[in-house]
């Protein structure tokens, strides 16, 4: 899949200490990501990961990052993220420790994920006041079915000069043609399986407003010879609040090289027909009152 990624002119790979309990970082090391010219960003979550428990306290940040670096087989990464807020640790303590790690050369860019806009502002003001490394990137969920970040978060990020990386641009898979109201069978490990530990996606999207929104999008996509996936990726590329000149980017997850090839190709295609753009707007008006908060 790295070959496919680089063939399309991309070099960034996103991972986290919690993904596969560290195994994804180890797998990247086996793939010799550094020799390929890949830029890796990893995240530290304030929770128990396997036998170890992490926080965003000063005494936990360096060991947590060190575990990631060891797994990746590297002395540094391109981006280090705080993976969801640690509300048990004062931000000043965390940010001072992050700044020390930055000055020591462990990473080039600093990122945060899943923080509320007011928290982003507080973080940036603390960093500015103390001369600490300010966040370069905010990573959050954003798709045609989850746009509540547009109202307050995007203006905040623009004010502080922070780029936005969108994960889950297909709303966990709902913006495909795989699922409908009648779906009752799921592949093993499926994120919409109510018996799966990852079934929290079901709580986010498996509801009547979501299916009503899909009823609006899918016929128009079919009319123009597109899958829902293709339409959703073209929407986020051309009709969302994301701006390439601000350093914004889409984080694409794929289970195969073929799927990655398809998703990257769809992101490269042009704007949507106007009636399909309007269908996405109408779909958002249906689901927005039912949308979960963008922050943790």
Curated annotation (Swiss-Prot):
EC supergroup of this enzyme: oxidoreductase
Entry annotation: catalytic residues: 19
GO MF terms, alphabetically ordered: oxidoreductase activity
Family: Belongs to the aldo/keto reductase family. Aldo/keto reductase 2 subfamily.
UniProt xrefs under Gene3D superfamilies: NADP-dependent oxidoreductase domain
Protein name in UniProt: Aldo-keto reductase MYCFIDRAFT_156381
EC number(s) given by UniProt: 1.-.-.-
């Amino acid at each position: 899949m790295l070959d496919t990624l680089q063939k399309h002119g991309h070099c960034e790979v996103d991972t986290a200490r919690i993904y596969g309990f560290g195994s994804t970082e180890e797998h990247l090391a086996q793939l010799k990501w550094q020799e390929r010219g890949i830029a890796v960003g990893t995240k530290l979550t304030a929770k128990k990961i396997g036998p170890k428990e992490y926080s965003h306290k000063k005494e936990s940040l360096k060991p947590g990052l060190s575990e990631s670096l060891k797994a990746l087989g590297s002395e540094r990464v391109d981006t280090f993220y705080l993976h969801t807020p640690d509300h048990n640790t004062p931000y000043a303590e965390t940010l001072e420790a992050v700044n020390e790690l930055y000055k020591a050369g462990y990473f080039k860019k600093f990122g945060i994920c899943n923080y509320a806009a007011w928290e982003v502002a507080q973080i940036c003001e603390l960093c500015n006041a103390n001369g600490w490394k300010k966040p370069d990137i905010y990573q959050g969920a954003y798709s045609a079915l989850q746009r509540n970040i547009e109202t307050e978060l995007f203006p905040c990020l623009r004010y502080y000069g922070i780029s936005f990386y969108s994960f889950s641009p297909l709303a966990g898979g709902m913006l495909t043609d795989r699922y409908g109201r009648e779906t009752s069978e799921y592949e093993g490990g499926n994120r919409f399986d109510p018996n799966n530990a990852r079934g929290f996606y079901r709580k986010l999207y498996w509801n009547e407003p979501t299916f009503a929104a899909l009823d609006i999008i899918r016929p128009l996509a079919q009319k123009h010879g597109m899958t829902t996936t293709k339409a959703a990726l073209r929407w986020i590329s051309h009709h969302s609040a994301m701006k390439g000149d601000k350093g914004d980017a889409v984080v694409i997850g794929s289970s195969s090289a073929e799927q990655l090839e398809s998703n990257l190709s769809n992101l490269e295609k042009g704007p949507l027909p106007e009636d399909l753009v309007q269908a996405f707007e109408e779909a958002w008006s249906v689901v927005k009152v039912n949308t979960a908060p963008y922050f943790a």
